[in-house]
Amino acid sequence: MSSNSKKIYDNRELSWLKFNERVLEEARTPDVPLLERFTFATIFQSNLDEFFMVRVGSLFDQMIIDSKKRENKTNMTSEEQLEAIFKRVKELEAVKDKTYKEIMESLEAYGVKQLDFRNVTPEEEKYLELYFKHEVKPLLSPLIIDKRHPFPFLQNKDIYAAIHLESKTGVKIGILPVSGAFKRMVFPSKNSLRFMLVEDLILHYAPQVFENYKVLDKTLIRITRNADINVEEALFDQDMDFRDVMEELVKKRKKLMPVRLQISRNLNSNALEYLCEKLDISENQIFHIKTPLDLSFGFAFSDILDDEKLHYSKLVPQQSASINNYETMITQIKRNDIMLSYPFENIGSFIKLLFEAAEDDNVVSVKITLYRLAKNSRIIEALVRLAEAGKSVLVLVELRARFDEENNIGWSKRLQRAGCTVIYGPPSLKVHSKLLLITRKVGDKIEYITQVGTGNYNEKTSTLYTDLSVMTSDVEIGLEANNVFNALSLGMLVENTKYLLVAPKCLQNRITSMIDEQIELAKQGKPAYVGAKINSLSDKVIIDKLIEASCEGVKVELIVRGLCCLISGVDGLTDNISVTSIVGRFLEHSRIYIFGAGNERRMYISSADYMTRNTVCRVEVALPIRDEAIKQRLWDMFCIMLKDNVKARIQMPDGKYIRKQNNLHPLDSQIYFYEEAYRKAENYRKT
């Protein structure tokens, strides 16, 4: 590993762990309401689950395929990355354990207390024993593992009680699945929030289940399985419906190899070795956890505890003040472009556009790409209504949206039954773009309404994620959007564009070309600037171009919420680059690209991060902002985020992140944007 690579590049996986550490920091922040802190701890845990299932799983796959292959930024092999990951995760888990303990101690002031059999009253113990006997034990399905009994299949992320039993013939293990049929929390006292987790109850009374054996020791275990399924390998039978292929792959995922074993207590070394042998788990894949193995039970407290101090204040998405309720959306979009900023503004105006299109006699067709949808989607309702109204409706459903495959398979069938034409993306590329095209014919004239978004067509996430949606009647944009859909309908890729940036053929190269233009301006002594607000930065081609720009004096300001493989502020290399990360109440999800300064500034919104998977391995779309009012609004938003000194962290030259601290008035950019949306909506309501 060269000294330069150490200084200016960070490993993708380790950088992501730094992001998750920032999530955990929110769980440790006293200013965050107590139950919201619990939520952040839960998000930290679920983030790690997915990280192991996908990223760690893929590294194990890479070790099997080519153990000597090195990552292209820090030159680490898969084995070296895994070793570093396991070490760092164990450190972070220790912090999470401490955080959970502090949160639960604070919740005692509100009557909440997690029980174990060291702190229950005699009356509570009697209730728990009877509860186990009558409500739990009859539903248990105990298993014995030894030489005569095959090792059972352990479900991904399920909790099991593992009981080491005395045996004269070798190691014998009892397994008790903690079924989803059980209520997770047991409350042994009426009108009290003192509770015991059902898995702790089962573990305590396990000797009653294995009453013919002597229990030597016992623990709770939870495994995480590799979920990095390969779609391309499954496409060997071209006659199979793609939905059938994906359904088979989803089943296959549930049975992939374990990559992590979590245990709640120490287990006899012989018993633990036996478990690891059966699970094909090495010692460094074992994680000793002092907190509950699944923290999702905490969400129930939000319904139980209504004290305002425990929750964020309610923020209701507002109707955009730029939208007039007394005119159709199409009429307003034809007059000027409209931008919605979620979750501060309501997605309802976009949904209204779709329903209006169903009633518009001039609408000929509607085309849309779908990636992740809400469980009860009004957007699907609108598309069905459009088809029932006789419009030509083309829907590209991305069946490979990870962990949403089953949901999308179901929606694709629903749309097809309604009369929509349903297509899928190219075999080797996910379609991640957020693109809608409404085509109207007014007399002899063809009109387009195009919408490009940074986030999914999902009503639920539109209240939780920060995203942008721009709707325009620009004919040139509409024509190019139509070209995108035509190419996808034919199973082809867009080879070139003039206005839209469309991956995989014309996004990365156009971005680097625009950075080159700023480099040339800097060489001429003219103002030069590159900015980006993205979720992740790992595309080495773009990273190296940004480093080149920094070396030539271009000012580069990046807002990167998650992983960032570029290290900023390194003398002589990246000292003209700053990296800010905002982790707050809402998940930062919008993408904004900026090239140039002042009147020469060009801006885009996009579904694509600066990651190789987005820039050259997916179909993505970036929309140029041609409306000057929206361009100014976007720039103002970007500047506000750079000034955030409440939820922003800044990256240091050693790759670490510290909270931004200054003597200025506290500015939480997310709260600022909500208050701005509320103020504008209130003024509109008064007119």
Which residue ranges define each predicted feature?
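Glycine/threonine-rich ATP-lid/beta-loop region of ATP-binding domains
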Residues: 540-543, 547
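Hydrophobic alpha/beta core scaffold segments
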Residues: 555-559
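N-terminal localization/anchoring segments of enzymes in phospholipid and broader phosphate metabolism
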Residues: 1-530, 548, 552, 564-687
